[in-house]
Amino acid sequence: MIKNKLLVVLIILTSNSVLLESSNLVIKNAEIYDGIENNSYQGHILINDGVITKISKTSVPYADKVYDAKGKIITPGFIAPDTQLGIVEIGALNVTRDDEASIYNIGFSIHDAFNPNSVLIPWNRANGITSAITLPRNTSSPIGGLGSFFLLDSNLDISSEADIAMIGRFGGSGSSSRAETLALIDDMLSFASSLDKKDMSSDASIDEVIDDSSLASHMDFKLRDVKALYRLINGNLPLIIKTHRASDIIKLIELKNTYNLNLIIMGAQEASLVADEIVENNIPLIVNPINNIPNSFDELASNINMTPILEKAGATLMFNVSRSHNYHLIRQGAGVAVANGMSYGGAIKALTSNVAKTFNLNDRGSIKVGNMADIVVWEADPLEPSSMPEKVFINGVDTDLTTRSTRLRDRYIRDLEKPNTYRN
């Protein structure tokens, strides 16, 4: 009898253990904005081992774990395309910055400096940002510096894609004449396009190329720099160039067509003046919908209606913010864009699938079968800043929404009725 009772207890404990460790989950009764279609639909999502395996609009799929969204909006996890998450903690404190290089220029990669325990990561994750593209600060070269993609799950076993984009700048933000900057970019791209597989076959071969090139010698190219330039021309590496003036955008379009660049323009405050040219040449844009007041003579055509104008023209849009740390404010920018005429579904795409497609993040950015389950359940409208995530799943894992701010709040309100001396 005792043996039978022990056996029953063992079976119960084992079954409970399996249930707790089960890796399949269904999110039911959700209003789904999938990042693909403009409109939402009611449905249920089945997740197995971190992957979306079924989406049903009728019956609820079976799973060991069930989360009832109760009609709330769910979206793909938002992807911030322009951040310094994990490499800058306090901008004014140099010892917390890993975004600048003193030796390398074009080939400078920030990937290995990423800190998954940055206190800024939980803060942005708790506001719906599940992944980010982290970019270095511009080097002394007009193009140069490599950004990487990171999941914001705070795991020491970092999930990332290294060196997925190069950055650059052109226009009034530079320290020299834009004519000289454009000529230098052209010369660098011409040098890169002259490289072949034989030149890149060994470090010794690359050293010979550097010695034989007056440009490479003058700019003190290193091995990493030449390899990065070769990838830019021959590996379809995205090139993000920050510029604003309409005439500068036209010049960059000419360079794109000359060298077959995978060009992305960031800033682009005068993009609405050349919307047709941007769309015709298939150039994605990273813009700040809130930034509608000219900050320089390069931005005189800035206006609050830019995003709906560009969307109507057919441009691929992504959003960034001018403030560091609070990268989650891209959803506030999306809300401003919608308030001024952009479609709601288009704004969700700008926060999710447009980023994934632009940077070749093939299994992220949308809620569809086969994609990783980066999903946010919102308590209300995700484009309303006062609305917060109720649940954030990254790779199907229900992540912790505790932040340093919430811990401080809880610490100091816990014993409010006690005199200050006796508070913990």
Region roles according to the model:
Residues 5-14:
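Sec-dependent N-terminal signal peptides
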Residues 91-114, 208-219, 284-287:
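Active-site gating loops and adjacent loop-to-helix segments of metal-dependent hydrolytic enzymes
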Residues 126-263, 388:
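Polyanionic/metal-chelating signatures
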Residues 90-91, 95-101, 105-107, 238, ...:
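His/Asp/Glu-enriched, well-ordered alpha-helical/loop segment
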Residues 30-33, 369-412:
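C-terminal cap of metal-dependent C-N hydrolases
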Residues 32, 36-75:
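Histidine-rich, glycine-flanked metal-binding segment
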Residues 256-263, 280-286, 314-316:
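Glycine-enriched alpha-helix->loop->beta-strand junction motifs that scaffold or abut catalytic
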